[in-house]
Amino acid sequence: MRTLIERLSTVEGLEHVLTRFTDSCARPYNGSIFENNRSPYHLTCSMQAVAYFGVRGDITDVLPRIRAAHIANWGPQVSEGVDLPHAGGTVTYALTYHREGGRCPDGRLMSAPTLEAPGLRIDWDRLHMPLPNRVEEPAACLPVESGCIYRRCSTVPDAPMSVAAARTRYGTILTFTLGGWGSTAYHYFTVPRRK
């Protein structure tokens, strides 16, 4: 996770603001007495990170640089790493969204753009678009809940600038989320249930 965040940090036009790391282990949900969806695991552990960046300049200048950094193949692609035309989750779609003002030629709203790859997602402020998005401040670190055995939450740097202050400085905030389904950090440690 740190390596990918560092690679994104080297993209011209992005300034790292903060990263929130979460590591937790829990007993899987096995449903109610009326459901038969017993997990094959007794314990699962997963990590997630959300890195916040200030965008210097226009996001449409930065998106091609993110693609050129080869952090992931963003969205569906055809041969030789070319984005599938009109496919969501790609840099090409995101650039078209901004160029067209978030509307199809017939006036319909386009779906909001993000960059997506297995276990990775990039999103950003789109404050003046038909489907606005505003990156929020990171949520407070949650306490250990029932079913959760362990949770560690940390922020780097220890005393970061707020997202609101970063937005005032840079104009646009971008988030890079790592973890979840498709990530090597999802269920990175499991304890199988004995049969």
Task: Give the residues covered by each predicted segment.
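Stable alpha-helical elements in mature extracytoplasmic
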Residues: D58-I66
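Acidic/histidine-rich, surface-exposed loop or edge segments in extracytoplasmic proteins
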Residues: R38-Y52
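N-terminal accessory/precursor segments of enzymes
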Residues: Y29-S39
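An acidic-aromatic pocket/loop used at catalytic or ligand-binding sites
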Residues: M1-N30, V55, A68-K195
